[in-house]
Amino acid sequence: MAVYLLAVAILFCIQGWPLGTVQGQVMPFMEVYRHSVCQPRETLVSILEEYPGEISHIFRPSCVTALRCGGCCTDESLECTATGKRSVGREIMRLSPHKGTSEKEVMQFTEHTDCECRPRSASGVNSRKHKRNPEEGEPRAKFPFV
């Protein structure tokens, strides 16, 4: 066993430790970039947020995994947006406290299949930066002699 551990230690010294195994190891740029681009990625989705009308039930688990668009775009005026979607089923347990029952069932969730960086909608970042109180009205030019 000691010989095996020594061989593994020598191998790691020659080839380097696998990524993420040693605290402080730096992830190479291309790997960082590949993980950060706009793409479908596994996301936890709350069942009650997807089905807000089901508040009288308890779900187990309370959230499920689904692929949703996420990641960075090359410009702040763009956002990662779904360009393709599909419906997927997830088996969950529905508990009805008022009836004292529980049953397994399949619920449908939207999953993103394709993503693309597209211009932000009117409610995006740019409009948030310049949002005004409706009572303020339109901005007016101020002149020193008025």
From Swiss-Prot:
Domain of life of the source: Eukaryota
Chain positions with Pyrrolidone carboxylic acid modification: 25
InterPro entries named in the record: Cystine-knot_cytokine, PD_growth_factor_CS, PDGF/VEGF_dom, PDGF/VEGF_growth_factor
The keyword Signal is annotated on this UniProt entry: yes
Tissue-level expression: Expressed by the venom gland.
Disulphide-bridged cysteine pairs: 38-80, 69-115, 73-117
Compartments, record wording: Secreted
Gene Ontology MF, one: toxin activity
Major localisation: secreted
Biased composition (Basic and acidic residues): 133-146
Pfam families (alphabetical): PDGF
Region of interest (Disordered), ranges: 118-146
GO cellular component: extracellular space; membrane
GO biological process: induction of positive chemotaxis; positive regulation of angiogenesis; positive regulation of endothelial cell proliferation; positive regulation of mast cell chemotaxis; response to hypoxia; sprouting angiogenesis; vascular endothelial growth factor receptor signaling pathway; vascular endothelial growth factor signaling pathway
Signal sequence range: 1-24
Keywords carried by this UniProt record: Disulfide bond, Growth factor, Pyrrolidone carboxylic acid, Secreted, Signal, Toxin
Purpose of the protein: Snake venom VEGFs that may contribute to venom dispersion and prey subjugation by inducing vascular permeability and hypotension. This protein induces an increase in capillary permeability after intradermal injection, as well as a drastic hypotensive effect after intravenous injection. The hypotension is mediated by nitric oxide (NO), which is produced by VEGF-activated endothelium NO synthase. Also induces angiogenesis in vitro. Like other crotalid VEGFs, this protein interacts with VEGF receptor-1 (FLT1) with a high affinity, whereas it binds to VEGF receptor-2 (KDR) with a low affinity.
Complex formation: Homodimer; disulfide-linked. Interacts with VEGF receptor-1 (FLT1) with a high affinity, whereas it binds to VEGF receptor-2 (KDR) with a low affinity. Does not bind VEGF receptor-3 (FLT4).
Family membership: Belongs to the PDGF/VEGF growth factor family. Snake venom VEGF subfamily.
The protein, known as: Snake venom vascular endothelial growth factor toxin
Organism: Bothrops jararaca (Jararaca)
